[in-house]
A protein has these predicted regions:
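Short Cys/His-rich micro-motifs in 6-15 aa windows
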Residues: 162-171
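Short metal-coordination and nucleic-acid-contact micro-motifs, chiefly zinc-binding Cys/His arrays
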Residues: 136-139, 154
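Short cysteine-rich clusters marking metal-coordination/redox-active sites
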Residues: 143-146, 158-161
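Core segments of small alpha/beta cavity-forming domains
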Residues: 1-71, 159-160
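Surface-exposed, charged secondary-structure patches
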Residues: 63-108
């Protein structure tokens, strides 16, 4: 279906705001891999994407390395398609990113592999899903554990009671990320 057709089904959907969210989640995800801090993005990603990201971070960590994605930015993102499934909506997004891609040794900071002088362009196909019976995003800004206000853009964990905020119950979650 087209974006206009989807807006008729979900009048709260805004293409520009959605793509801004996609770009931010993508940058946060690669930054979380680089910093070996996947908890900071756990609430934005599915279990499969978490496992993919964790495998990259774990391999680097186990070897005493760090995967670097320096000077990371999104050059372009666009909605390829929108599908309605029985229990969820699916939006496929094409994303063009640029970054320095290299690996460093954590003990001395030396470069192990890659290029820290020239950015590469990498294209991705991303899939975002949202449950049809989701609650409104405004309601989701309260911790499910204690009711305290939470900032879902910075962390998926309540700073008061440590409850984990599950974004898929309320909003779009990245469920697939593949190089195009």
């Amino acid at each position: 279906m087209t974006v206009d057709e989807f807006v008729k089904m979900d009048n709260s959907f805004n293409e520009g705001m959605f793509l801004t969210k996609v770009n931010n989640i993508f940058v946060k995800l690669l930054t979380a891999i680089m910093m070996d801090d996947l908890d900071s993005v756990r609430h934005f990603i599915s279990d499969d994407v978490y496992k993919w990201a964790e495998s990259i971070a774990k391999e680097a960590r186990d070897n005493g390395h760090r995967q670097m994605y320096d000077e990371l930015n999104v050059k372009e993102s666009k909605i390829d398609s929108i599908l309605e499934e029985p229990r969820q909506y699916v939006i496929k997004v094409y994303l063009q990113s640029r970054y320095l891609n290299y690996i460093i040794n954590l003990s001395d900071g030396s470069m192990v592999s890659g290029n820290d002088h020239s950015r590469i362009q990498v294209n991705y196909n991303l899939i975002f899903t949202k449950r049809k019976a989701t609650e409104k995003q405004g309601i989701a800004r309260k911790c499910p554990g204690c009711g305290a206000p939470i900032s879902v853009n910075t962390s998926g964990k309540c700073e008061y009671c440590d409850s984990i905020y599950n974004q898929e119950d309320y909003d779009w979650v990245i469920t697939s990320l593949e190089k195009a």
